[in-house]
């Protein structure tokens, strides 16, 4: 009889211990997920999300944007060939594509110097038919505190096809996938 009671007591102890360990493990892992910062969550979302493709109906260029970004309705954009996608959950991230007419007939290098000065770019890189600019974000010649921009200008005849990203400086690592997409952007794929 004493042997049976020993097994029953041991079984209760093992079941109770397993339940407590499972509960504590769940509680710890749940709290760790809550402790992940918004930037870490954004970075994970950017890495895992599907990229949607937008094809401009007038010019035919394509851009890739994260599936969780929202598109600004065409009715709010009055420029032909312009589109914008954004993520506005406390952090304001905007991916924009638009067309600029090259009325002055700038070469790629001249265009880079002109737009770099206009946008207060601190970094620039030039290719055969494109250039990349980045730096602190300015709107109406005033700096936007804590924000940066990254843009690619591609020259096609008398047009500049532009894809630009504006984002909080604290999100630089989180938007690295979008920056890489802009780096590799071909106007017509």
Specify the residue positions occupied by each region the protein language model found.
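Secretory pathway targeting signatures of secreted, lumenal, and periplasmic proteins
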Residues: 52, 57-112, 138-142
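Hydrophobic membrane-insertion alpha-helices, especially the h-region
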Residues: 13-29
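Sequence contexts marking disulfide-bonded cysteines in secreted/extracellular proteins
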Residues: 46-48, 82-83, 125-127, 172
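Buried hydrophobic packing residues in well-ordered domains
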Residues: 69, 163, 185-186
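Ser/Thr/Pro/Gly-rich low-complexity linker/stalk segments immediately outside membranes or between
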Residues: 31-49
